[in-house]
């Protein structure tokens, strides 16, 4: 569980709720029956209870692009959402957000509970258009396409790259954009940013670019990748 303080820069409403999100997650992680020190159980649990640092990178990066943008009624998808912090950012921008996670229990006990508490505490009655989808990415289905797709710390398994590509290919609007926040390497798991970039480029459908790098000289280098359809 990350102890990092969440900072939604340039959005006053988001600054009000950041501590609530952290405090709630700290309580919840103690109450749910997940083995200690377990990040992943392949095919059963994909880390949705933990707040991953790449999700924190996303929610500090997104306001730099969208703080002054009108995103009302934009369709946004967060893949592998867990706590859903990037998706919540877009909810507060009045977008229609679909939260996707492998585990239904994560969506019910964590993501949806956040949204309910935020709506009640801050009278955010405008938050209405929320969808939840659980399950493996190979079974992902939606009745809409998305203007924006975001995902944090989901590129750790090379076996998932084809599934991710298929979602982008089938559900990203032609003028849409996807942001994947990722570690440069996932030690002991197999995935890496370079492997994913090579995979996406090999499909010859999308442009993929590194648009942000976090390198503190101590921890794993982290990147934000931007994906758009080729012109």
For the regions a language model picked out, list residue spans one by one.
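S-adenosylmethionine-dependent methyltransferases
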Residues: 1-231
């Amino acid at each position: 569980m990350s102890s990092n303080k969440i900072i939604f820069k340039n959005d006053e409403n988001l600054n009000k709720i950041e501590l609530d999100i952290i405090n709630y997650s700290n309580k919840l992680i103690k109450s749910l029956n997940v083995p200690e020190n377990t990040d992943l159980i392949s095919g059963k649990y994909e880390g949705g209870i933990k707040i991953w640092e790449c999700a924190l990178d996303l929610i500090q990066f997104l306001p730099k692009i969208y703080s002054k943008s009108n995103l009302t009624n934009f369709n946004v998808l967060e893949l592998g959402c867990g706590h859903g912090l990037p998706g919540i950012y877009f909810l507060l921008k009045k977008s229609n957000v679909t939260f996707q996670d492998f585990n239904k229990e994560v969506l019910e006990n964590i993501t949806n509970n956040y949204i309910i508490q935020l709506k009640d505490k801050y009278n955010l009655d405008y938050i209405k258009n929320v969808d939840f989808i659980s399950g493996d990415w190979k079974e992902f289905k939606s009745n809409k396409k998305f203007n924006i797709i975001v995902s944090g710390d989901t590129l750790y398994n090379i076996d998932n790259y084809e599934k991710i590509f298929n979602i982008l290919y089938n559900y990203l609007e032609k003028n849409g954009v996807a942001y994947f926040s990722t570690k440069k390497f996932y030690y002991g798991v197999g995935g890496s940013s370079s492997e994913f970039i090579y995979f996406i480029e090999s499909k010859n459908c999308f442009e993929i670019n590194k648009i942000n790098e976090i390198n503190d000289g101590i921890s794993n280098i982290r990147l934000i990748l931007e994906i758009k359809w080729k012109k």
